[in-house]
Amino acid sequence: MRIFEPHAHMFSRVTDDYEQMALAGIVGVLEPAFWLGQPRTSVGSFVDYFDAIIGWERFRAEQFGIRHYCTLSLNPKEANDDRVNDGVLALLPRYLEKDGVLGVGEIGFDDITPREERYLAAQLELARAHDLPALVHTPHRDKVRGVERTLAIMREVKFPPERVLIDHNTEQTVPLVIDSGCTMGFSIYPDTKMDEPRMVEILRQWGTDRMVINSAADWGKSDPLKIPKTVNLMRQKGMAEHEIEKVVWHNPVSFFAKSGRLDLRELDTPVSPNQLFEGNSILRGPRA
C-alpha cells in the first residue's frame, strides 16, 4: 500500500528516517514550515530555511525514492515576534509560486493572541490570492478554543473550508470540525497528541471521509513511521483495506491536489539516486 505522509518536518530528521519511510511504503511527504525550537532573529533566517525546504530537502528525499513537497508560512509561534512577522509575510508571495509548494502552512494558533489572529487571517488571504489550500495548526494548549477561533476567522474572511486542513485534532475537537467541510488531520505521537488505538477508535466512530493521519515528526520525541504503524493496527482491528487506503493515500493526495501542483504521475515515477544538488550529494564523497 502506498502512503502519502501529509505532515513531517524532515528538515530536522536524519537519512535513516528516509530509508525506513521508503521501506514502509511512504512515497510522498509534505513538509510544513514550522518553528525550529528557538526563536529566529531575522527575516534572513527564514529565507535560508525556505530555500532549504524547497531545494536541498526536496533533493535529499528524492535520493531515497520519496517525493518531497511543502507548505510555507509564518508559523503561529513566531507570528508574535515583531522582529520577523511582517517581514516574513512580505517575503511569502514569491515563495508561494515555487515548484513543490502545495499550500500555505502551518498557520493558526499557539497562544491564541491578537497577533496570531491577525496573521492567520492575513495568510488565509495569501492562500486565496495564490489559489492554494491552507494547513492549520491547532494549539497544544486550550485546543478547543483554538479550533473555535480558527473556524470563526475562516468564516470572517470567507475562506472556503474545503480548502483547509485543520491538524492535530483530538477526540474533543472532532465534533467541532466534522461538519465544517474542512479536512481533519491527526498527529500520531509517542506520548502526546494522539496514539494509534485512539486513532482507530476515532475512525470507527466518525468514519474516514476527509480524515488524514500524520506523524508530525520533528526535532522532538516523534516517530516518522507512525502512519505505517497505525495502518498495522487498523488491519488488526479489521478495518477494510479500501478504508485504510483512503485515510493514508486518497484523502491527503486529494486535498493537496487542490493546489493544482501535485502530479500523481510524478508520485509513480522512480527517482534516480545518482543526482547532484548544486554540486553536492548525500554520499559525502565518492563511492567506496
Task: Describe every region a protein language model picked out.
Residues 33-37, 188-193, 217-218:
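Short, acidic/turn-prone active-site loops that include or flank metal/cofactor-
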